[in-house]
Amino acid sequence: MTIKEIANLAGVSISTVSKIINNKDQNINPETRSRVLKIVKDYNYTPYGNVKNISTAKSFQIGVLLRSGSQTNLMLSGILHAAQESGYSILLYDSGNDMEMELKHITSLCKNNADGIIWEPVSEQSMQYERYFTEQNISVCYINGYTECSFLIDFARMGYILTQKLLDYKHTRLACLLKEKSQRSALVLEGFKKCLYENQIPYSEKMELYISDREYFSKIINYGISGIVSSHFASSLILYEQMERLHYYIPSDLSLVSLKDDVREGISFPHISSVKIPYCEFGSYICRELIDKCEKREHDPEYLFAAPYVFDNEDSLEPPSFMRVRKIVVVG
């Protein structure tokens, strides 16, 4: 952050900022002084700060700058474990989906001379801030970002595996239960479509159901759906509860498969057939990749992260009701 940028943010001249930070502000309006000082502190400005801080000495600190604090704890655990294993400490920041807050955190990370950053940008516009890290020679690994060189969990692959499991149970009338404006849901749907295509099952927009749609359950019944792929475990629980309330049951009336994140790990009932999202493994992986960059052990990384995907149970799976053999016992 330069003195010119501070002046622009405060709406004053460069000389005014210079006078305030050098205690030569006797003739400056107190309100202006307070505003400038707040911006100086918020954006971690220090005179000649861009002349580094360019110490070549390593700090053995890694910054983690997340889009929001709703990130899974297991991903952070994975990052922390991999960092400690290699002798690094972590600086953790939450942008709160706010680009202004994000920039303040970026200037703080630069001031603290972090060796590298794991960065989840708030928006595509956030990429303009990349120059602050470039100027300080700070290595960056992006996650869930707006660049081709961004690390992602392969949710499309997971969507494919969930769908294939229903097909293995002979379900062909399928739907995908999603959340609107969710990157995870969009990728799960992509895998869902690919699996249908490769199994020569026609795709229809009617197969897309959104948990925010009050009519989604009626659509399941009216469309004769026998199997559901769910991108979020919370949505699966809502569906499960609604079915029981209306005297429909899983798996006898509907088979259900879902992704499951770590906040749901302790739920032992209902038994929904799920694949755990590998957040911890992902966190460890991106941290190791960043440390390799910091220590000049660069190679071509795999940006799409995949792990062995295993169902925790198959309790919410049965073949479609019309395929089940009914046994009749004749007495007498």
Describe the role of every protein-language-model region.
Residues 119-161, 234, 260-272:
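Flexible loop/hinge segments that line or gate small-molecule binding clefts
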Residues 162-201, 302-316, 321-329:
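An alpha-beta-alpha
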Residues 147-176, 186, 212-218, 236, ...:
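Hydrophobic alpha-helical segments within soluble ligand-binding/sensing domains
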Residues 1-57:
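N-terminal helix-turn-helix DNA-binding module of bacterial transcription factors
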Residues 63, 106, 113-121, 173-179, ...:
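Periplasmic-binding protein-like
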